[in-house]
C-alpha cells in the first residue's frame, strides 16, 4: 500500500509540472562591405564569436525555453524571426530581453577579424577568438575567454574568470567581482581588479598600470620593460626577480623602486596574498 501511494504521489507531482523545455535553432548570413560594427547581447545564454570571412557575418542561434505552457510556440516564433538588425555594416544581434521571459538564446557568430565588437550576456560565458577592435565584453555571471583582441579592450564579469590576450597597443580594463584574471601581451595602460581571486599578467607597461585583488596572489612578468614599481600586500610577501633602485619602502610587505631604469608606474596591491615580479 505504501509503495502504491508513493507511486501515485510521484505521478501527480509530475503531472503538475509545467511543460518541459522547448528549443529551436536559426541561421542567418549577413553580407557586409566594410569594417563591421557588431553588437551581440543575450539575457541568458552563451556568446561565442570566431573569425570568419571578410565580407559576411554568419549567425547561428539556439533558442531554449525552460518552462511555460506556450513555450514551444514562443520559441518557434523567435527562431522564425530572430532579433537581428542590420543597417549597412552596423549589425545588432539580440536585445529586447524583456520580451523573452524564461527564454535563453545562445549565439555562435563568425565575423571579420577587424570588426568593432561589443558582446554582453546577463548570465553565460563569452568566448571570442580572433575578432574585435576596441572590444567591450561583459557578462553578469560567467567567464570571459578572449584571444586576438586588437587595440584596447574592456572585459567585465560580475562573477567569473577572465582570460584575455591582446594584439597590438591599447588601453585595457579588466574587472571581476569574484574570479581569476589572466592577461597576456598587454601594451598600454592597464587597470585590472578582482574582489577575490588571483591576477596574472605579462606585457609592457607603456602607460600606468594598477593591479588589485581583495584576496589572492598577483604575478607580473614585464620582460625587459622599464617601470616604477609600487607593490604591497596586507598579508603575504612581495618579491621581485629584477634588480631595483629602491625609492623609499623596501620590506616583505611593501616595496617601491625603479626596475630597468624606471618608467610608467605599476601599482600592485592585494589584501591577502603574495606579489611576484618575475
How does the language model describe each region?
Residues 1-278:
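Intrinsically disordered, low-complexity terminal regions
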Amino acid at each position: 500500500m505504501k509503495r502504491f501511494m508513493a507511486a501515485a504521489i510521484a505521478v501527480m507531482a509530475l503531472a503538475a509540472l509545467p511543460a518541459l523545455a522547448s528549443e529551436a535553432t536559426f541561421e542567418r548570413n549577413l553580407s557586409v562591405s566594410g569594417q563591421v560594427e557588431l553588437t551581440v547581447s543575450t539575457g541568458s545564454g552563451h556568446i561565442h564569436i570566431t573569425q570568419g570571412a571578410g565580407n559576411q557575418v554568419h549567425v547561428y542561434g539556439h533558442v531554449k525555453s525552460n518552462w511555460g505552457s506556450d513555450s514551444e510556440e514562443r520559441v518557434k516564433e523567435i527562431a522564425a524571426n530572430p532579433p537581428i538588425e542590420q543597417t549597412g555594416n552596423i549589425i545588432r544581434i539580440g536585445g529586447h530581453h524583456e520580451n523573452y521571459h524564461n527564454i535563453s538564446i545562445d549565439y555562435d557568430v563568425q565575423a571579420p577579424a577587424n570588426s568593432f565588437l561589443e558582446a554582453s550576456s546577463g548570465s553565460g560565458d563569452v568566448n571570442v577568438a580572433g575578432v574585435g577592435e576596441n572590444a567591450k565584453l561583459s557578462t553578469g555571471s560567467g567567464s570571459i575567454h578572449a584571444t586576438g583582441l586588437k587595440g584596447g579592450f574592456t572585459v567585465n564579469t560580475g562573477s567569473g574568470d577572465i582570460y584575455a590576450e591582446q594584439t597590438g597597443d591599447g588601453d585595457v580594463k579588466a574587472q571581476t567581482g569574484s574570479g581569476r584574471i589572466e592577461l597576456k601581451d598587454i601594451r598600454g595602460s592597464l587597470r585590472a581588479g578582482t574582489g577575490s581571486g588571483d591576477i596574472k599578467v605579462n606585457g609592457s607597461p607603456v602607460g600606468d598600470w594598477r593591479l588589485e585583488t581583495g584576496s589572492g596572489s598577483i604575478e607580473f612578468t614585464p620582460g625587459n620593460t622599464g617601470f616604477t614599481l609600487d607593490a604591497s600586500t596586507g598579508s603575504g610577501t612581495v618579491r621581485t626577480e629584477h634588480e631595483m633602485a629602491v625609492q623609499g619602502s623596501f620590506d616583505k610587505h611593501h616595496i617601491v623602486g625603479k626596475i630597468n631604469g624606471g618608467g610608467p608606474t605599476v601599482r600592485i596591491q592585494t589584501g591577502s596574498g603574495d606579489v611576484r615580479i618575475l
